[in-house]
Amino acid sequence: MYTCPKTCTLTLKFFIDRFHTDYRLSKLAISFFDQKKNKMADSIPVKKKGSAKGPPSFVTPEYIEKQRQKKLEKMAKKAARKPIAPPSNAPPEFNTDFIKREMLSIPNYAPFETEKSALDITIMTYNVLAQTNIRRSMFPHSGEALKWKNRSRMLANELTYYSPTLGCMQEVDAEFVPNFYKKLLGGLGYELHFIKGEGKTHGIMIFWKSSLFKKVQDLTIYYDDHDELPGRMNTKNIGCCVRLERVDDPSRGLFLATTHLFWHPYGSYERLRQGAILVKEVNKMAQSHPSWPVFIAGDFNTEPFDTNFPALTTRPLSICQRATDIIERSMNYVFGESELEEKNASTKTENDSNEDDKEECQSSSTSSVPESTASTPKKRILHVQNDYVPHYRSFYQQHEQNPVLFSLYSVGYKLVHPENAKNTFDHPAFTNWAHAYQGHLDYIFVMNRDTSLQTPENQVVEGIKLKALLRVPLPSEMKEAEPLEGRYPSDHVALMANVQIV
């Protein structure tokens, strides 16, 4: 047992002072214990380096630095365990989540027989809102949701979640294709085909799962260059189509086309023409494989009651009086140069009058078309039209020669969501929810290539069954104009159909 020499000396001194008054005896005793203390101190074993914690026999600068570093590391670990509260004035992190919608199954669906090697696929169409078209006056409630750094993350989350087999996009910014769309879609297992009209900053895109399909042909349709059905003016709109072979069986495949038709509220005449050209050219391309399915999906800027829709989907043509009135007013309308620009880019700034904004941003509905051409503002009479303007009936003739198209949402949505299938031809109320306009503009069509065949029961056309449709929100579920944080990244909502093909 080790006893401190200093403690012993003090104890003895106290005892002698109290009980023995002889000074010499006290001095002698204290001297003896001082010597004993020194010997005991010398006999304490020296601790080996590293055998226990504590300072060395003498402190060096290296030792001090080492201890300082240990203390800093300990403080850093402790700080890492404590969450750092953001400054009270820091903005909250942007919510890149989105409203997830369910696929609604078609009742009484029955798959094809297994020996036919049927393939389940999903087809999406989505106008993703070009960044170059955005003006804040058009999206007064969108705030931070308009910034590409935020919208792009919402788009990425949405595409990853729905993961369609095939997809069509419109208003795809050309500048974002290499570093965003190709990287995102490539990472999700897609290949893509992108094309844009001359002088445009955005275009249209088709993408497909490379594990299932391989592109062997593509076609670009330039509506302005079509001399057989000349237009009144150049709009720079285009369409495109790809032929995709199945990886597991190259003798089988499909055709997929997309487009973005002329946007203007008074543009029904041009849309009727462009729709006729699109179906004609896609059908011509598809003649190489008569048994393959043909899908056409995109933003047609066409309400179901607009003239172009019944021209695409009824045989014989069934054009009601409302649609006839729309096309006649459109034919009589005279466009100005500025009206051929993009729909959002051409809108007025916040400093312009509200009346001008209203005039420029009307929707493609009968309420947006003047009752007579006399109401056309004189400032628009800037003759950009061609000298020869064919009558719209010539477009009807081309439509009648084309194969008929069936809208998959018109066919099936009333069966899965009847309370939201009250629009013309049983469509949902809207696919576009903007500030100045809300309506149904986007479609997924399938081409009926052989009208001489009677379509079997539970098939849309020969060899194609509709299995499910992506739910479209009710108007009552919507808020201000999209895009909005945590809701939708575009002013359009995506459509998607699940079909089985053989």
Curated annotation (Swiss-Prot):
GO process terms (BP): rRNA processing
Designated name of the protein: Probable RNA exonuclease C9B6.11c
Cellular localisation: Cytoplasm; Nucleus
UniProt region (Disordered), positions on chain: 338-379
Matching Pfam families: Exo_endo_phos
InterPro entries: CCR4/nocturin_mRNA_transcr, Endo/exonu/phosph_ase_sf, Endo/exonuclease/phosphatase
Similarity comment: Belongs to the CCR4/nocturin family.
Any one cellular-component term (Gene Ontology): nucleus
Species in which this protein is naturally found: Schizosaccharomyces pombe (strain 972 / ATCC 24843)
Start-end of Basic and acidic residues biased regions: 341-351
PANTHER family hit by this protein: CARBON CATABOLITE REPRESSOR PROTEIN 4, NOCTURNIN
